[in-house]
Every structure is written in C-alpha cells, then in structure tokens.
C-alpha cells in the first residue's frame, strides 16, 4: 500500500475538523474553526460530494487528496470572510432566511388621475 493510499484511508477515518486540516496540511486559525466548525465541515462535505462525479476512470489517491485539500481550503476561507448566517448551510438557518425587502424604483411609479379630476383641474386654470 502506497503512502498516498494510506493517507486516503486515514482521510476516511477523520472525524474532526482539526484532523482534516492536519492530514491535508492546511493552515488554519483555531479560533475560526472553533466558531465555525460545523459550518466548515458541512461546506467541505458539499464541496467533495460533487468532486469527480461521472468520472470515467477511477481517480488516483493523489488527485483525490489534492482536490480534497482544495475543497477544504475553499470551505475554510468561506468562513474567514462570512458567517454561518451568510451561507445558511443548515435547514434551520435556511428556513429562517429573511425575505428580501421589496424595492420599487421611483422611475417605475406612475400616477394616474381619474378623468373627472383632470377636467376639474382644467376648469380651475381658467
């Protein structure tokens, strides 16, 4: 068994965010992970779920680990600039997403006057 195959097996046994960061050699701030652990793991899981779908041939451990590392970096960076509320990855947050406020530009507003009001105004101008 090659070193990469062993590393891939170890990847499959990881159970904490820190284990993934250490195994894939990704630098991280423990404070960011402490606050966003579940969000990072969820984002990471969604990222790797779509990797190599429909690949005709078996993907090598080297390619898998490289792509897993890139996915973990994307997941981590997503939460260094935004919060869990911004991403809303979990159902409880999706369900409580605020409705966007309606916006109507003033150029879209038209005022229509009833016909009687227009004739009254014309009579007043005389």
Curated annotation (Swiss-Prot):
Q: Where is this region: Disordered?
A: 104-126
Q: Which InterPro entries match?
A: NifW
Keyword list (alphabetical) reads: Nitrogen fixation
Identify the Pfam families for this entry: NifW
Does the keyword Transcription belong to this entry? no
Which GO terms are recorded in the biological process aspect for this UniProt protein?
A: nitrogen fixation
Similarity remark: Belongs to the NifW family.
Q: How does it assemble?
A: Homotrimer; associates with NifD.
Q: What's the stated role of this polypeptide?
A: May protect the nitrogenase Fe-Mo protein from oxidative damage.
Show the HAMAP family listed in the entry: NifW
What is the protein name given in its UniProt record? Nitrogenase-stabilizing/protective protein NifW
Per the UniProt record, the lineage of the source organism begins with: Bacteria, Bacillati, Actinomycetota, Actinomycetes, Frankiales
């Amino acid at each position: 068994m090659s070193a990469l195959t062993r590393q891939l097996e170890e990847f499959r046994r990881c159970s904490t965010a820190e284990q993934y960061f250490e195994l894939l050699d990704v630098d991280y701030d423990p404070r960011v992970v402490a606050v966003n652990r579940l969000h990072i793991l969820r984002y990471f899981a969604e990222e790797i779920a779509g990797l190599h779908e429909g690949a005709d041939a078996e993907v090598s451990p080297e390619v898998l680990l490289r792509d897993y590392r890139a996915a973990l970096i994307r997941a981590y960076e997503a939460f260094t600039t935004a919060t869990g509320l911004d991403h809303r990855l979990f159902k409880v947050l999706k369900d409580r997403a605020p409705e966007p406020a309606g916006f109507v530009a003033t150029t879209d507003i038209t005022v229509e006057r009833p016909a009687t009001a227009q004739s009254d105004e014309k009579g007043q101008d005389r």
